[in-house]
């Protein structure tokens, strides 16, 4: 033979070996151009031409492994796309629930503030509106029951953790009421949190029954003076692409606008706000009112025949239930929006990965076919020249 047949000829240029002394007998191997193998193959050239496009992801695998990975990515893409569609359908219902509940909640808060202001002017004390020096705070932390929603649960638990640390630095004890399976798992396995109760969501959408369970626990803690202040930590729904964890003061219902500790220092969170949901052009919007703003005046058209204390006794349970239900609804809407965005990103990543894997698979398959053809032709040429 004029030259030995081996795999090295695929990667190297023709050699000037003395074994082919005759200039007339050309080896087929000497006329072949080097075959370029890409990084996903086991045989890698020292230098690859800059004109040869490389895949965006360097994948090293055989043809069978690539085919299995492509099938796996396709199945994952179907799952993420289905979850995105489900979240998109549910987030619309959750958003509608928040918007439809806004007029009732807003009007109820205005009436309660007006009645409470009237009671304070008459030196009438109501248990849920008494501002005491803050020695202990109850945090109602609302999280989700499921994962696969980006950083939704992590953001609200981090917000609650920072709030607990801030209160402890001021020498104020803190007790946590966790709502949601993810929050329950987070707080229960950490010894630095004093967990009063862990509550799990019961249905697909929040109901007044679920809110009433939380309201009863909050009411008993505040009235028995086990805590001096109650705060809601939940995720505020702003839009389908934005949601922020916030802190909202639930009790006491006071016109003074702030709560102080035994030293007279304000213990309200810096971002503590009263949020009012509004709808503009059929879309959900948020109107913010700082704690320092003037509270609504008593309407001259609003007259009550009953005693203010009797009215507050009858309406405060409704107030607690409505505020907690609103927090649950906003948290659910934020969770669904976050899951929809996360699944959308996962679907896009799956499409891109499938594209890269398919390209690598086609190149590996083409290289294998080309190599087999070259071996057949080279073997035939060697037999002809022998």
Curated annotation (Swiss-Prot):
Residues 1-22 are annotated as: Disordered. GO terms for cellular component: chloroplast; chloroplast thylakoid membrane; proton-transporting ATP synthase complex. Gene3D superfamilies: 3.40.1380.10, ATP synthase, gamma subunit, helix hairpin domain. One of its GO terms (molecular function) is enzyme regulator activity. NCBIfam families: ATPsyn_F1gamma, PRK05621.1-2. It is found in: Plastid, Chloroplast thylakoid membrane. Pfam families: ATP-synt (PF00231). Disulfide bonds join 260-266. Residues 1-60 form a transit peptide. It comes from Arabidopsis thaliana. Coiled coil: none annotated. Produces ATP from ADP in the presence of a proton gradient across the membrane. The gamma chain is believed to be important in regulating ATPase activity and the flow of protons through the CF(0) complex. The active site is at 149. PANTHER family: ATP SYNTHASE GAMMA CHAIN, ATP SYNTHASE GAMMA CHAIN 2, CHLOROPLASTIC. Belongs to the ATPase gamma chain family. F-type ATPases have 2 components, CF(1) - the catalytic core - and CF(0) - the membrane proton channel. CF(1) has five subunits: alpha(3), beta(3), gamma(1), delta(1), epsilon(1). CF(0) has four main subunits: a, b, b' and c. Induction: By light. The gene is ATPC2. It is a peripheral membrane protein. This is ATP synthase gamma chain 2, chloroplastic. Keywords: ATP synthesis, CF(1), Chloroplast, Disulfide bond, Hydrogen ion transport, Ion transport, Membrane, Plastid, Thylakoid, Transit peptide, Transport. InterPro entries: ATP_synth_F1_ATPase_gsu, ATP_synth_F1_gsu, ATP_synth_F1_gsu_CS. One of its GO terms (biological process) is regulation of root morphogenesis. The keyword Iron-sulfur does not apply.
């Amino acid at each position: 033979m004029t030259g030995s047949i081996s795999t090295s000829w695929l990667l190297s240029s023709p050699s000037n070996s003395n074994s082919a002394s005759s200039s007339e007998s050309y080896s087929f191997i000497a006329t072949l151009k080097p075959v370029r193998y890409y990084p996903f193959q086991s045989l890698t050239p020292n230098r690859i031409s800059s004109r040869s496009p490389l895949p965006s992801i360097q994948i090293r695998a055989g043809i069978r492994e690539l085919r299995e990975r492509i099938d796996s990515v396709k199945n994952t893409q179907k799952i993420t796309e289905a979850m995105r569609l489900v979240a998109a359908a549910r987030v619309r219902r959750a958003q509608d629930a928040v918007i439809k509940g806004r007029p009732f909640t807003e009007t109820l808060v205005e009436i309660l503030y007006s009645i409470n202001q009237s009671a304070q002017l008459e030196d009438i004390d109501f248990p849920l509106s008494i501002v005491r020096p803050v020695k202990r705070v109850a945090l109602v932390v609302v999280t989700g029951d499921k994962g696969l929603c980006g950083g939704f649960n992590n953001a609200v638990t981090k917000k609650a953790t920072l709030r607990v640390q801030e209160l402890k630095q001021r020498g104020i004890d803190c007790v946590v009421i966790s709502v949601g399976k993810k929050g329950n798992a987070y707080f229960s396995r950490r010894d630095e949190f004093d967990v009063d109760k862990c509550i799990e969501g019961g249905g697909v959408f929040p109901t007044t029954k679920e809110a009433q369970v939380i309201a009863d626990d909050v009411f008993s803690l505040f009235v028995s003076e086990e805590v001096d202040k109650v705060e809601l930590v939940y995720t505020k729904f702003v839009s389908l692409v934005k949601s922020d964890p916030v802190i909202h003061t639930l009790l006491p219902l006071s016109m003074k606008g702030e709560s102080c500790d035994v030293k007279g220092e304000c213990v309200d969170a810096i971002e503590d706000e009263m949020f009012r949901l509004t709808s503009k052009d059929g879309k959900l919007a948020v109107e913010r009112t700082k704690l320092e703003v003037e509270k609504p005046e008593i309407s001259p058209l609003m007259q009550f025949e009953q005693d203010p204390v009797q009215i507050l006794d009858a309406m405060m349970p409704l107030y607690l239930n409505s505020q907690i239900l609103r927090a649950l609804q906003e948290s659910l809407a934020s969770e669904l929006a976050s899951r929809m965005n996360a699944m959308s990103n996962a679907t896009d990543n799956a499409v891109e990965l499938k594209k890269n894997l398919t390209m690598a698979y086609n190149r590996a398959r083409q290289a294998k076919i080309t190599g087999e053809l070259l071996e057949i032709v080279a073997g035939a040429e060697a037999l002809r020249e022998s």
